[in-house]
């Protein structure tokens, strides 16, 4: 056994816990600082983590900030500036840049006929503006002045080219009047199968109760005279869509159905599309602009319905996928061609 190993043997039976219990708090803190794993070569670590904490030392004296600043300022003034390697002599080298003078092109003297000279000399600013527009000098005026002079047979720019352009005064367009349809009376006429009632238009009536719309769809099942049924912007949801689907399975006289701009989800649209397959009289279907996008599965179902239902010749929906859009366009072209051939017979 070597001497080094013999030296280590006497430390094997030492009780480390007993030694730690006899250390003071200051000694324990110093021991903890010594045992910290530091990596001074790791440049990715901050400086405080690459070395031991050295800021807990007691101050060597009082700190006087003003005296320290005064000392630093005095030291900076007393330090002699370093001399230049090559002294500056003030000599200017090279030639200064002088902007070359540009020659102003001489304007060509244009001689006009005496009649034109006299007419132009006595023309007003408004007439000069119209003449410039006729000659195509649109860079001298605004677009409004140019098109007013070209399109109007009279002098429109009465103040000349440099005048302030006034905007056109458009006539106010009033809002469309509300839908005057009486829902209760409409429901009675549908239930009584009125011969004169061929269109049910409830567009933009947003306070219709759901039970009333459900009763209207229920009455449409046995109606044989209504050709168009429109529920645009009525805040209809999936319950109304299911009622419309049940109506389509039994009604055999309806030709146009419009349920655009509502709150129908993909489930409600899928129910309507499945019911359209069982209806052979419907020629127009519009389901666009719902509150949420129906999804790829619904768009594929729309294309399949159009392919399987040759009676539909008008379909209102903006496809977002190329595949269903191409299939639907091909199906609509085929359906319209079949309708045209039937009319020729």
From Swiss-Prot:
Basic and acidic residues composition-biased segments: 336-345
Region: Disordered, residue numbers: 40-64, 326-345
Keyword Nuclease: no
GO biological process: pointed-end actin filament capping
A Gene Ontology molecular function term of the record: actin binding
This protein's UniProt keywords: Actin-binding, Cytoplasm, Cytoskeleton
Similarity comment: family membership: Belongs to the tropomodulin family.
Protein name: Tropomodulin-4
Gene: Tmod4
């Amino acid at each position: 056994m070597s001497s080094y190993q013999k030296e280590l043997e006497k430390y094997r039976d030492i009780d480390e816990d007993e030694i730690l219990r006899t250390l003071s708090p200051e000694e324990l803190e110093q021991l903890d600082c010594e045992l910290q794993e530091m990596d001074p070569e790791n440049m990715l670590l901050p400086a405080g983590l690459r070395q031991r904490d050295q800021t807990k030392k007691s101050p060597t004296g009082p700190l006087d900030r003003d005296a320290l600043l005064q000392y630093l300022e005095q030291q900076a003034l007393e330090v002699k500036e370093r001399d230049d390697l090559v002294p500056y002599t003030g000599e200017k080298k090279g030639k200064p840049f002088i902007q070359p003078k540009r020659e102003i092109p001489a304007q060509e003297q244009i001689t006009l006929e005496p009649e034109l000279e006299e007419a132009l000399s006595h023309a007003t600013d408004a007439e000069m503006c119209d003449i410039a527009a006729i000659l195509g000098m649109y860079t001298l005026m605004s677009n409004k002045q140019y098109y007013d002079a070209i399109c109007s047979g009279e002098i429109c720019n009465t103040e000349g080219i440099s005048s302030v352009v006034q905007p056109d005064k458009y006539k106010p367009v009033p809002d469309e009047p509300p839908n005057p349809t009486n829902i209760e009376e409409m429901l009675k006429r549908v239930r009584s199968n009125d011969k004169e009632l061929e269109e049910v238009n409830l567009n933009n009536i947003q306070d219709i109760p759901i039970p009333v719309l459900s009763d209207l769809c229920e009455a449409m099942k046995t109606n044989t005279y209504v050709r168009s049924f429109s529920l645009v912007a009525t805040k209809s949801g999936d319950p109304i869509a299911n009622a419309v689907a049940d109506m389509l399975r039994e009604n055999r006289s309806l030709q146009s159905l419009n349920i655009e701009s509502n709150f129908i989800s993909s489930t409600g649209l899928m129910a309507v599309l499945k019911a359209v397959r069982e209806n052979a009289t419907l020629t127009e279907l519009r389901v666009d602009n719902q509150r949420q996008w129906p999804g790829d599965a619904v768009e594929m179902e729309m294309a399949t319905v159009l392919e399987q239902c040759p009676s539909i010749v008008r379909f209102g929906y903006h496809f977002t996928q190329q595949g269903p859009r191409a299939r639907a366009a091909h199906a609509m072209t085929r359906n319209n061609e079949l309708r045209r051939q039937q009319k020729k017979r």
